[in-house]
Regions:
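Charged, compositionally biased N-terminal leader segments and the immediate start
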Residues: 1-9
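N-terminal-proximal low-complexity accessory segments that begin disordered
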Residues: 8-44
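Secondary-structure capping and boundary motifs in well-ordered enzyme cores
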Residues: 11-15, 35, 43, 73-76, ...
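Conserved small/polar residues in nucleotide/adenosyl-binding loops
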Residues: 22, 39, 255-262
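Extended, charge-enriched "interface" segments that sit outside catalytic cores
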Residues: 27-30, 40-116
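Short, solvent-exposed secondary-structure capping/transition elements
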Residues: 34-35, 51-56, 60, 144-147, ...
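Duplex nucleic acid-engaging cores and interfaces of nucleic-acid transaction enzymes
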Residues: 94-101, 105, 112-115, 119-257
């Protein structure tokens, strides 16, 4: 590394340091609780934007024919992405701890978000009825296999992902969009005022109802963050397998050579 390179901090890593300061405010007990919740939200919004714009560009540079080197620190795009992911992993662990602290401080004020396994049997039955009447009718479960095209997954949207086994033993993947303007994300427990459950957790718990002909092997919630420089939605054709479209898009990116970032 050149002597001049030691005088600079990589811009992307410096930005993460800034966002950590935002996160620190969310964990600062001297800051009012409502403001701390706002800081936690700002941290996540900032991180989404960072991955959509900054990391997205670095990923494109990694696929370029010519290696792109950041001219202040001499780091390649690949080195920057590696450092970014390692740092974000640390920040996300810190965020999880702060989130638990915030939830703990909200509880004495009469606001709680709980998991399904903490409900009584009667409460579970009430929420099952709520799911059947107010959520399930508005869900669009999909099954993806070798013969079905992979669907477009929208940016910053939640999806329930399940690994399925058919009655004939064939393995498939199920995808259920969880973001919907028809039902609320926060569902209040009828027997506990101020106590809420996230709609995606309710969907995941009862997801077997959406796939009655399959055995659920594994299930989880995922969220997609897309590169803001690529408008993949405009390129997508409903009759086209999204995997094929992405392959074509990557092949196109291989012929691009973005200039180094300042």
């Amino acid at each position: 590394m050149k002597k001049t390179e030691k005088c600079y901090t990589n811009r992307e890593l410096s930005w993460l340091q800034f966002n950590e300061r935002v996160l620190n405010e969310a964990g600062n007990p001297r800051v009012p609780l409502a403001e701390r919740m706002t800081f936690a939200s700002i941290y996540q919004t900032n991180l989404d934007e960072f991955f959509m714009v900054r990391v997205g560009t670095l990923m494109m540079q990694m696929n370029a024919k010519e290696k792109v080197i950041e001219n202040k620190t001499g780091m390649t795009s690949e080195e920057q992405v590696k450092e970014i992911l390692a740092r974000v992993c640390q920040l996300e662990k810190k965020k999880a701890k702060i989130y638990e602290q915030l939830m703990g401080e909200l509880e004495p004020k009469g606001i709680r978000i709980i998991n399904f396994n903490r409900l009584s049997n009667e409460e579970g039955r009430l929420l099952e009825q709520y799911f059947d009447a107010h959520i399930a009718p508005f869900l669009s479960p999909m099954v993806i296999g070798k013969q079905q095209p992979f669907p477009f997954l929208a940016n910053k949207q939640l999806y329930a992902i399940v690994l399925l086994t058919s009655q004939k033993g064939k393995k498939k993947t199920g995808i259920v969009p969880c973001s919907n303007s028809v039902f609320k994300r926060l569902i209040e427990i009828p027997t506990r005022p101020g106590c809420f459950m996230l709609s995606e957790e309710l969907i995941l718990h009862f997801i077997s109802k959406l796939y009655p002909k399959y055995t659920i092997r594994e299930k989880s919630i995922m969220r997609v963050t897309r590169n803001a420089d690529i408008d993949a939605h405009d390129l997508y054709d409903e009759d086209m397998d999204y995997r094929d479209m992405m392959e074509q898009l990557i092949n196109c990116l291989l012929y691009t050579s973005p200039s180094p970032r300042d």
